[in-house]
């Protein structure tokens, strides 16, 4: 991928506009998880140290365009940034028309960009106003790279220079390493409740990987496709033919979708529901499958240990309940100890990484949800495509 990297530019005295992804959870005016802010700080601090006049904006929540409300304010985010920098940071409420000055080496935060009219629909007039504020536009929000909006795509068309930030560059390099030229064997783990929401990902990965591990509710549809009884488990019966096709298609080229030989069941979805281990052939009509059993988990751990590349998106069981979390724990630990390159992404996956404390043992953790999935699907990310276009002049 050929794009300009912010680290390649001389930024001294330049007006730099950074689009970051600081869409963090806020409760009672306080940020409850600052991971995305921390991830964005490297680009911000790099530009400040370089002596640039630094402006950063992000979206937060889902505000109504043209109507600013206090709960949509980036103030809680600014409080965290100020604390990290150890200095006061200005928050500029009305900024699209300019009218504010930034000193060399200073950072100002521009209020929630999704409040601006024309932002979501990528209106040129809005994008041109943004571009007029800067000499260099830096896209650092991989989490919104799959959306063409005025602050992620439009501004990149009109800014004098458009570059990728440190975080975005790292994300794209990691994705390219895992998907464009993966070390073999390549294993993908795709979990989640529904095949329908991950169908395009499953189809795209089924053509690339050596083993496609399915987990969660998705796995039940594949179990059913193999003629197993899944009882009252979450299962999309209308997608059984699709699951069969994927199994056959992969087998035809010597690849596989490993199917569980043992499962952990309960009768209802409840934190206190007792876990019952069964062979995959012995599931009763009133059972619900909530996890894979130890034999299946060990089989996956052995596959992961031999992998050159591991792409991980989603748990293999209801790991938020400990009695149904052993499968996900075994898989997580196998990934943590695997010598291969591991790339993980998605909210549930990150929750599992945090729960089992393997943050520093996964090669690369993507901060993005939707964009990560769309990249896995092989889709063009508009915010990245425009950076490549601009780099070619």
Curated annotation (Swiss-Prot):
The keyword Disulfide bond does not apply. GO terms for molecular function: ADP binding; ATP binding; phosphoglycerate kinase activity. Transmembrane segments: none annotated. It is an enzyme of class 2 (transferase). Pathway: Carbohydrate degradation; glycolysis; pyruvate from D-glyceraldehyde 3-phosphate: step 2/5. Keywords: ATP-binding, Cytoplasm, Glycolysis, Kinase, Nucleotide-binding, Transferase. It comes from the Bacteria. It holds the Pfam family PGK. Its EC number is 2.7.2.3. InterPro entries: Phosphoglycerate_kinase, Phosphoglycerate_kinase_CS, Phosphoglycerate_kinase_N, Phosphoglycerate_kinase_sf. ATP binds at residues 198, 320, 346-349. It is found in: Cytoplasm. Substrate binds at residues 21-23, 36, 59-62, 114, 147. It catalyses: (2R)-3-phosphoglycerate + ATP = (2R)-3-phospho-glyceroyl phosphate + ADP. Signal peptide: none annotated. One of its GO terms (cellular component) is cytosol. GO terms for biological process: gluconeogenesis; glycolytic process. Its main location: cytoplasm. Monomer. HAMAP family: Phosphoglyc_kinase (MF_00145). Belongs to the phosphoglycerate kinase family. This is Phosphoglycerate kinase.
């Amino acid at each position: 991928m050929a794009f300009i990297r912010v680290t390649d530019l001389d930024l001294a005295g330049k007006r730099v506009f950074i689009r970051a992804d600081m869409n963090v959870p806020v409760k009672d005016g306080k940020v409850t998880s600052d991971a995305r802010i921390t991830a964005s700080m490297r680009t911000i601090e790099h530009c400040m140290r370089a002596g640039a006049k630094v402006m950063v904006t992000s979206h937060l929540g889902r505000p109504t365009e043209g109507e600013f409300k206090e709960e949509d304010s980036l103030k809680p985010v600014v409080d965290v940034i100020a604390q990290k920098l150890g200095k006061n940071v200005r928050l500029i409420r009305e900024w699209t028309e300019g009218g504010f000055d930034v000193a060399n080496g200073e950072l100002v935060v521009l209020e929630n960009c999704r409040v601006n009219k024309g932002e979501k629909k990528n209106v040129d007039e809005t994008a041109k106003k943004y571009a007029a504020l800067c000499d260099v536009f830096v896209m650092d929000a991989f989490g919104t790279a799959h959306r063409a909006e005025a602050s992620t795509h439009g501004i990149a068309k009109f800014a004098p220079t458009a570059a990728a930030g440190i975080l975005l560059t790292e994300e794209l390099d990691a994705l390219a390493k895992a998907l464009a030229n993966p070390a073999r064997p390549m294993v993908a783990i795709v979990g989640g409740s529904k095949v329908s929401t991950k169908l395009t990902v499953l189809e795209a990965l089924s053509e690339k990987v050596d083993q496609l591990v399915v987990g969660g509710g998705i796995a039940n549809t594949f179990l059913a496709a193999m003629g197993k009884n899944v009882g009252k488990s979450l299962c999309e019966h209308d997608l059984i033919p699709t699951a069969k096709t994927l199994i056959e298609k992969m087998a035809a080229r010597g690849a596989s979708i490993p199917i569980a030989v043992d499962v952990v069941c309960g009768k209802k979805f409840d934190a206190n529901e007792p876990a019952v281990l069964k062979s995959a052939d012995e599931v009763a009509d009133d059972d619900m499958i909530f996890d894979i059993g130890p034999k299946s988990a060990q089989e996956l751990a052995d596959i992961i240990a031999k992998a050159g590349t591991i792409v991980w998106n989603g748990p293999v069981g209801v790991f938020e309940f400990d009695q149904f979390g052993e499968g996900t724990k075994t898989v997580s630990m196998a990934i943590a100890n695997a010598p291969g390159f591991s790339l993980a992404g998605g909210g549930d996956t990150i929750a599992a990484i945090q729960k089992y404390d393997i943050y520093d043992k996964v090669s690369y953790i993507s901060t993005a949800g939707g964009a990560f999935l769309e990249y896995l699907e092989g889709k063009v990310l508009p915010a990245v495509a425009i950076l490549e276009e601009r780099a070619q002049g």
